[in-house]
Amino acid sequence: MAETAYVPRLREQFDREIRGKLTEQFGYANVMQVPRLDKVVLNMGIGEAVNDRKKAETAAADLALIAGQKPIVTYSRVAIATFKLRENQPIGAKVTLRKAKMYEFIDRLINVALPRVRDFRGLNPKSFDGRGNYSLGIKEHIIFPEIDFDKMGETWGMDVTVCTTARTDDEARALLTAFNFPFRQ
């Protein structure tokens, strides 16, 4: 009795529709040339963690709820006296998502979290880095449904970087548009 393995909705959509569309649009000779999602990196920098270590731990716990896997706490590398920052102090958290968790996160980001942003007019189409990767900033992490709004003491921003195997920004934009990323016109 062989049960089929779980495949995220966006991965299935990529295999069925998007791959063929991109091959036709850009004229790829090989299936492996078609750009695909590589990883998603979530980063939370907590400036207030300089004075209170618990804020970095709270941010890491929230990031774990959002991402579905344990984040790495990031530490300062150098001491900066003007910020009262010493070396090796916790100042944030980051997590890298790949495979199924990556597709699930992007699905929740596009369909649930971004529509909850106040005054959302679309994503900036100029936030590509020139090598096919896209970065966006989120001002309040409470837009994710995993975070309980009533229990939140503070809200923090976070960076989301979507890394693709695309070689150019045009290929990456076509890939992310096919995944229904709401780019501004």
Curated annotation (Swiss-Prot):
The keyword tRNA-binding applies. One of its GO terms (molecular function) is structural constituent of ribosome. The keyword RNA-binding applies. InterPro entries: Ribosomal_uL5, Ribosomal_uL5_bac-type, Ribosomal_uL5_C, Ribosomal_uL5_CS, Ribosomal_uL5_dom_sf, Ribosomal_uL5_N. One of its GO terms (biological process) is translation. Keywords: Ribonucleoprotein, Ribosomal protein, RNA-binding, rRNA-binding, tRNA-binding. GO terms for cellular component: ribonucleoprotein complex; ribosome. SUPFAM superfamilies: RL5-like (SSF55282). This is one of the proteins that bind and probably mediate the attachment of the 5S RNA into the large ribosomal subunit, where it forms part of the central protuberance. In the 70S ribosome it contacts protein S13 of the 30S subunit (bridge B1b), connecting the 2 subunits; this bridge is implicated in subunit movement. Contacts the P site tRNA; the 5S rRNA and some of its associated proteins might help stabilize positioning of ribosome-bound tRNAs. Part of the 50S ribosomal subunit; part of the 5S rRNA/L5/L18/L25 subcomplex. Contacts the 5S rRNA and the P site tRNA. Forms a bridge to the 30S subunit in the 70S ribosome. Belongs to the universal ribosomal protein uL5 family. This is Large ribosomal subunit protein uL5. The gene is rplE.
